[in-house]
Amino acid sequence: LVVTAQKSGGVLTLTGQLSPPDSDLTALYRGLCLGLRDYVQKNGFPGVVLGLSGGIDSALVAAIAVDALGADAVHAVMMPSAYTSQKSLDDATKLASLLGIRLDTVPITPAMTALEKMLSDQFAGTNPGVAEENLQSRLRGLILMGISNKHGPMVLATGNKSEYAAGYSTLYGDMCGGYAPLKDIWKVDV
């Protein structure tokens, strides 16, 4: 409701009109921001930390976090591997700059090399595949949980409902987090 007040001769006249309702996606976005803000504040977290990959899901979660909590309360971490494209790195860096959030880079290649060496006997005689891919995701979750445990921000998972419903995610990896803002949002709405 938009109201204009005029006072004339001791009489206050109010006139106004109702603003049009939000579009469905605008209302959904506002609801996602409200849900995250309420959860973080009611549970006493000083802020949030999330992995920023350069993809659309993590970009949307970062934007929701900034609108819900303010840029100072959002810490993004890029965790590149040998397979991370320069475009993904550039996109994540540009987004963090546009949102005004802290962005740190923690390369996972040294940890992957160490894990592959540690597991070489167990993985001997097999072709690289899903197990190795999942190690990368789990390393990223471990890094975010370490930051959370040390400094207190809650980890945000960046998966969406389509990924969770189809099982297209890694337990203890990209599902890692205290809150998943997109958990009830189908990929088509992301």
Which stretches of residues belong to each language-model region?
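RNA-binding accessory domains that recognize and position tRNA/RNA substrates
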Residues: 1-49, 66-67
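A conserved beta-strand->alpha-helix junction
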Residues: 2-11, 73-78, 86-131, 137
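Alpha-helix capping and helix-loop boundary segments enriched in small/acidic/polar residues
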Residues: 23, 52, 56, 79-87, ...
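Conserved helix-loop functional segments at active or binding sites
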Residues: 37-46, 67, 71-74, 114-121, ...
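ATP-dependent adenylation/pyrophosphate-handling site
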Residues: 46-52, 56-93
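Residue-level signal for inorganic ion chemistry
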Residues: 55, 96, 156
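Flexible loop/turn segments at secondary-structure boundaries
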Residues: 56-60, 83-87, 105, 111-115, ...
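Active-site adenylate/phosphate-handling loop in enzymes that bind or generate adenylated species
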Residues: 99, 122-190
